[in-house]
Amino acid sequence: MQIKVLYFAKSREVAGVNEQTFELGDGAHTEDLLAQIIAAHPALDSVMKTCVFALNQEYVRPQDKEALKDGDEVAIIPPLSGG
C-alpha cells in the first residue's frame, strides 16, 4: 500500500522534501511507517520525538499502532516556535 507523508516546518527542513510516498505491506501501522521514515531520513530521529502526527487530518500517536490503508495521508508537524 502507498502512504503519503507530508513534512512541515523543521521536519521538512531536515527531510529536504515537502512530501513523500512510502510503500508498506498490508497490515502495516503507524509505527511501521515511522520506522521507514527514520530509515529514509536518519536525521529526523531527534526531530520526531517532539512532533505530533496526523493520520488523515486526525491526530494520532505512532506508538498507538493505528492501522494504515492504501492512500492514507500522514502529516508530521513539529511544535510551533518563534515570535
From Swiss-Prot:
Post-translational note: C-terminal thiocarboxylation occurs in 2 steps, it is first acyl-adenylated (-COAMP) via the hesA/moeB/thiF part of MOCS3, then thiocarboxylated (-COSH) via the rhodanese domain of MOCS3.
Pathway: Cofactor biosynthesis; molybdopterin biosynthesis
A GO CC term assigned to this protein in UniProt: molybdopterin synthase complex
Gene3D superfamilies registered for this protein in UniProt: 3.10.20.30
InterPro entries in the record: Beta-grasp_dom_sf, MoaD_arc-typ, MOCS2A, MOCS2A_euk, Mopterin_synth/thiamin_S_b, ThiS/MoaD-like
NCBIfam families referenced in this protein's UniProt entry, alphabetically: moaD, moaD_arch
UniProt protein name: Molybdopterin synthase sulfur carrier subunit
PANTHER family for this protein: MOLYBDOPTERIN SYNTHASE SULFUR CARRIER SUBUNIT (PTHR33359:SF1)
Entry keyword annotation includes Cell division: no
Species: Chlamydomonas reinhardtii
SUPFAM superfamilies, A to Z: MoaD/ThiS (SSF54285)
GO biological process: Mo-molybdopterin cofactor biosynthetic process
1-thioglycine carried by residues: G83
Keywords: Cytoplasm, Molybdenum cofactor biosynthesis, Nucleotide-binding, Phosphoprotein
